[in-house]
Amino acid sequence: MPAAVYVLAAGVFTMVTSEFAVAGLMPQLADSLGTGIEQIGYLVTVFAIAMTVGGPALTLALLRVTPRTALLTIFVIFFAGNLLAASATSYPAMVAARVVTGVAAQAFFGIAISLCARLVDPGIRGRAVGVALNGLMLGTLLGLPLATLIGGRLGWQAAFWGIAVLTVIAAGLTLALVRNPVAEPDSAEVRTRLTGELAVFRRPQLLLALASSTMIIGATFAMFSFLTPILTRISGFGGDTVPLLLLAYGAATLLGNIVVGRLADRHTGGVLLIGTTLNLAFLVGFALLADVPLPAVVFMLGIGLVGITMNPAMAVRVQRAGSTRPLVNTVHASFITLGVILGSGLGSALIPGHGLRAPIVLGIGFAVVAVISVLPMLRNPHLRNGTRPEVEMPSVGSEQPGTMSAGASN
C-alpha cells in the first residue's frame, strides 16, 4: 500500500477528531456558551450542513490546482477554523468555527478518497479506502476520547488547540510524502473533466447508492450524536467512565472498518446487507435497554461494529455506480453528512418533547430504510461484487491507478 494512503489516513483522523469532538464535549460547551444540550447538538448539524453544501463547492474551486496543493490549502482553512473554535466565547462564534472546519473537512474527504482509489489497482480499492478510513475509526477510538478527557481536565478550549496542532502535523506529512500526478491537465482539460464528472450524476444506480449512504449513516448518527448524554443520563454511567466507553466504541469501529475494508471489493452487496440488518437489530436493542448498563454497552459496541464502518463498502458501491473522480467522492461524502444532518438535527428536535431515547428510535427508522435501499444492488453483479471490469468515466488527463507515487513530480 503506498505511503501516501497512510498519510491521507492521518489527515482524515485530524478532520474526524474535530468533527466528533463536540459529541464528547457537550456538557462543557453547554455550560460555557450558556446553551442547552440540544443547542450544542445543533453544532453537529451545522458542521454537517457546511460539509454538504460547502465541501463540493470548495472541491470544484480546487480542481484547477494540483492534489497536494489542494490538500495543503484545505489544511490552512481547517487550521484557521480550529483556532476560531478554541477562542470562541459565544455560541455564534462556535457556529462560525464549525462552518469553516466543516467545509474544509468535506473537501478533504472527497479528494483523499479519490486519491486512494486511483493510487491502487481496481481490485483493492475498497481495501485502500478502508486504510484511509482507519483515520475515521481512529478518530473515534482515540481522538474522541482524548478530546473528551482533555476537555474534562483542561477545558474544552484545550481540545481544539490540540486539534490545531494535529492539523500542522498532518499538513507536514502531506507536504513530505504526498506527490502530484506525473501529468496535470491544462485548463481546457479541466473543463472537459468537469463536464464528464457532472454527467455521471444522471445514473439511477449512483443516485440510489448516494441515498443509501445517507440512510446508513443517519441511522448511526441519530444515536451517536447524543451518546455521551445517553450514557450518563439514561444508562447511569459517571463522567469518568464515559471516555473509557467511547474508547471501547472507537475500538469496535476500528475493528469493523478493518473487516469491511477487506471484504468490500469482492462482497460489497453482502457486506452492506448484513451490516445494515445488524445495525437495525442493535439499535432496537439499545432503544429497549439503554437504561440497563450492561446490555446498553453491548448494543452500543454492536452499533460501533456495523454502523459507520460500512463506509468502505459504500465507497466501492458509489465508485462502481459512478466513478473514482474527486467530485463524485466529495458529493458522496456530502450525502453521508446529509445523514449526519438528518440524524443529529431531527434528534435534537425530538429531545425536548420525547427525551434522549427518541434519537435512538429515530435511528431505527433510518436503519429500516437503509436495509431496503441496499436490496436493489443485489440484482446487479457488478455493483454486488464487481464481477465485470469497471468502466471508468472518460476524462482527458485522468490519472490511472499507480500513476501517483513518492517519485512522481512535485
Label for each model-derived stretch:
Residues 97-137:
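Cytoplasmic helix-loop-helix junction between adjacent transmembrane helices
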Residues 270-314:
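C-terminal transmembrane helical hairpin of 12-TM major facilitator-type secondary transporters
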Residues 54-67, 256-268, 351:
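Helix-to-loop junctions at the C-terminal end of transmembrane segments
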Residues 34, 66, 87-93, 104, ...:
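Helix-breaking motifs and short loop linkers at transmembrane-helix boundaries and internal kinks
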Residues 320-356, 362-363:
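A late C-terminal transmembrane helix in Major Facilitator Superfamily
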Residues 81-84, 92-101, 294-302:
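Paired small-residue
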Residues 108-120, 308-322:
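Intracellular juxtamembrane helix-capping segments at the cytosolic ends
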Residues 53-92:
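Conserved MFS/SLC helix-loop-helix module at the cytosolic interface between two early adjacent transmembrane helices
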